[in-house]
Amino acid sequence: MTTAEGLRGDALTSAFKDAIAGRPDRLYVLLSNASGLPGTRVNMVLAQAFAVDCVALGKASDRLVIEMCNLDAERAPGDSGGEFLPVCGVLALGFRSAHDPNPALRKKALLILHALSEDFRFRVREVVPIALARLGAVMGDVLVHEFASWTDGFFQGAAALQAMAQPNFLPVIDDVEALLARLDESYALAKNAPRSASRYPGFKALVDALATTPAAFATRFGIPVFDHLVTYANTQIKELRAAVEAFVRSPKLTSRYADETKRVQRALDASVPPPRDPTLAVKGMRGRGKKRDRR
């Protein structure tokens, strides 16, 4: 995300001051109207401008930021301008906790972001990894270790992986073993999920993260990541096989790590079960039961 300036325009800046003083209604209306929602593109420039002003104001903005994060779907319905309010709150929370080293604020921020990572409103969920990455850019490996408490949930695990893959967080991660532990935990969560979980949006979000983030990790840490993907390839779960296949096809890797991607592909190929041999079918196994009696 590019560097942004604060809120512009007399109406917005005046409404922001009123909101800080405990009168947020006018700010909520202005932000909602300029949100771009309902629509396909959220006004992230405006959300970032709000976050910048919250950072500039410091601790005095925290009450408003947390209030906006806590707006539920009744007060801020999904797919409406109202959904933009918690989006702004989440982004501002990430900015504020990144700029203020207060442990209490960071602990509270992580608790709020953990809860919102599984919010019913998908735009709120989508901004959580961005907020986490802001925090990760200053916390580094400490946050990677904190994510051990995130990888026991589908949406939370997806948010943690996506945050670590962000370009402002990944370069400051030095503990490759901790990162790979989070990747292993996320993979195990998906692998050990009941079959019915495949219909759950959280499972799909985690599988999507497993398909997209390992390539970024591999560009940072190289062969150790490929070693783990080789083990992940040994599965018959179609969603996880597709995730590994997406890793192999990643344009980030095909030229620089051609031999390693081929190694993962060979592991995938080797894990394909042999085709069923019809000559081994036992006579009388087919056609039994009530349907046969009705022929």
Give residue spans per PLM region.
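N-terminal alpha-helical scaffold/docking segments in eukaryotic complex subunits
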Residues: 1-87, 98-99, 245-295
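Amphipathic alpha-helical repeat scaffolds
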Residues: 17, 32, 47, 51, ...
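Alpha-helix capping and inter-helical loop/turn segments
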Residues: 19-25, 50-64, 91-108, 132-141, ...
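Generic ordered-secondary-structure signal
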Residues: 39-42, 61, 81-84, 91, ...
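Extended alpha-helical scaffolding segments
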Residues: 54, 169, 173, 182-275
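Eukaryote-skewed repeat-based solenoidal scaffolds used as protein-protein interaction platforms
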Residues: 78-204, 208
